[in-house]
Amino acid sequence: MSAFTPASEVLLRHSDDFEQSRILFAGDLQDDLPARFECAASRAYTQQFHHWQALSRQMGDNVRFSLVAQASDVADCDTLIYYWPKNKPEAQFQLMNILSLMPVGSDVFVVGENRSGVRSAEPMLADYAPLNKVDSARRCGLYHGRLEKQPQFSLESWWAEYNIDGLTIKTLPGVFSRDGLDVGSQLLLSTLTPHTKGKVLDVGCGAGVLSAALASHSPKVRLTLCDVSAPAVEASRATLAANGLEGEVFASNVFSEVKGRFDMIISNPPFHDGMQTSLDAAQTLIRGAVRHLNSGGELRIVANAFLPYPKILDETFGFHEVIAQTGRFKVYRIVMTRQAKK
């Protein structure tokens, strides 16, 4: 995190207004403005582990990563600055949670890119903190209101589920493919053969559908699942539990918290971070897999066909094969050999 996002640049146009404010930053925190903003006090709350990693280097205990915000995260803050994400249900979940903890009378600012749908903040908060647009620049909108009424928030009411091939998939707002199995994951699942054995790592596990499907027909696998998203981690745990399956699930920025080696690594890696296209996670996944695969172990990933993964795979492993494809997606398979660049 270094250069400021357009949303942060819009906020900086109003920096003089915040000098006496005790601010809680939340939402899609794509830069380190919360650590550098001049104000009376600054805290941050995030559901994204990689955002927590970046901010905690400068903010220490004043930034927290978790599924839901707690009263201690709000502490004595009198102002919320919320960065609007591209996912509206995610925004609603986070705002209802945070505003249920903020004291009535708190200042509420919402900022985001127009293309992210930040305009939806006005109707969403109309009953709690009626918003007015106070600035428009850098293709972003900045909105302000005062909290008039705290919303009621209950985590249980936000859970949803769907069924696929006899499996119950538990989901939360902000989890990839929350409303059903995406086409890419479906293609990857079609390549997983029954009676797979050994240690399997599911990177970017989302709601845990890949691992649950694999374990349902390969009961001898030992599952490890990880994701940067707190809702995804909790959803995966719930999915495994709902289907009587076992596995270790934890938050990790690709391999940052992963220890040991595996016989198979599976993933449908993201190529967006917030509104921005980013291949960082996929590149880290491919290059880091060398250090986490046993000899003869396999990396199997699905990706949009237009993404330049073959080049990265060949640079890292010396080869790749496409084992399934449609017009939009390809499933790549690589077997760990001595030639791979460690």
Swiss-Prot record:
One of its GO terms (cellular component) is cytoplasm. The keyword S-adenosyl-L-methionine applies. GO terms for molecular function: 16S rRNA (guanine(1207)-N(2))-methyltransferase activity; nucleic acid binding. Gene3D superfamilies: Vaccinia Virus protein VP39 (3.40.50.150). It catalyses: guanosine(1207) in 16S rRNA + S-adenosyl-L-methionine = N(2)-methylguanosine(1207) in 16S rRNA + S-adenosyl-L-homocysteine + H(+). Transmembrane segments: none annotated. Coiled coil: none annotated. Its EC number is 2.1.1.172. It is found in: Cytoplasm. SUPFAM superfamilies: S-adenosyl-L-methionine-dependent methyltransferases. The keyword 4Fe-4S does not apply. Keywords: Cytoplasm, Methyltransferase, rRNA processing, S-adenosyl-L-methionine, Transferase. Monomer. Specifically methylates the guanine in position 1207 of 16S rRNA in the 30S particle. HAMAP family: 16SrRNA_methyltr_C. Belongs to the methyltransferase superfamily. RsmC family. This is Ribosomal RNA small subunit methyltransferase C. The gene is rsmC.
